[in-house]
Amino acid sequence: MFQPAGKRCFTIESLVAKDNPLSSEEPLRPAALPYPGAPAEAFVSGFPSPAGRSLYNNPELVFPETVSHPPLTVHPHQLGASHLQHPHSFFAPQHRDPLNFYPWVLRNRFFGHRFQGGDVSQESLLLHGPFARKPKRIRTAFSPSQLLRLERAFEKNHYVVGAERKQLASSLSLSETQVKVWFQNRRTKYKRQKLEEEGPDSDQKKKGSHHINRWRLATKQPNGEDIDVTSND
């Protein structure tokens, strides 16, 4: 009679023990795997980074490496948590500020006010914001004596240029630009006053005389001869 063979155990421990009789009888347990320091840091941070990285050859665009990572001594299944707890220093608060690597933003009048934080006042937005206006030109306050001298010079000549304007400005302790602007404004005022004095009828008279002169030239009529343009004869 054959005796029944004993039941074979197909556990990992029995199979390993059968192949390696010298091995230990203790079951295998998962253990922490050692990882070198440098590759682990590169894995956690996403990519290896030196002490300072530069996008371009501009010294203003350098990313300083301020956050250092400790050597990795955790279990492999904890790598995901470590990656969330220690993000790369590029995403640190001081690097999220675009002013650190885009210095031209502040020099741009349309975008500079958007990245200045909470210290931006309403006055600075009006001066440097997208709707900033050019500062108004300060009007010169002329003294009565200066105005009198300027009016007399205007009566003699409505256009003062060159050495005459330079001499007049020097005698009044003014700049040539101030004298030039005053004469421009005075000529505009003079023309407006002349139009107001003549009224709308003066324009019609000028147009009528212009047409009559053209008719005389076309028909070669003398100027002294009275011509009845309304006669039907």
Curated annotation (Swiss-Prot):
The keyword DNA damage is annotated on this UniProt entry: no
Compositionally biased region (Basic and acidic residues): 193-206
DNA-binding residues: 135-194
UniProt keyword terms in alphabetical order: Developmental protein, DNA-binding, Homeobox, Nucleus
Compartments where located: Nucleus
One annotated GO molecular function: DNA binding
Annotated InterPro entries: EMX-VAX-Noto_Homeobox_TFs (IPR050877), HD (IPR001356), HD_metazoa (IPR020479), Homeobox_CS (IPR017970), Homeodomain-like_sf (IPR009057), HTH_motif (IPR000047)
Region feature Disordered, mapped onto this chain: 192-233
A GO-annotated cellular component: nucleus
Main location: nucleus
Keyword Cell wall biogenesis/degradation (UniProt): no
Function: May function in combinations with OTX1/2 to specify cell fates in the developing central nervous system.
Protein family membership: Belongs to the EMX homeobox family.
Protein name per the record: Homeobox protein EMX1
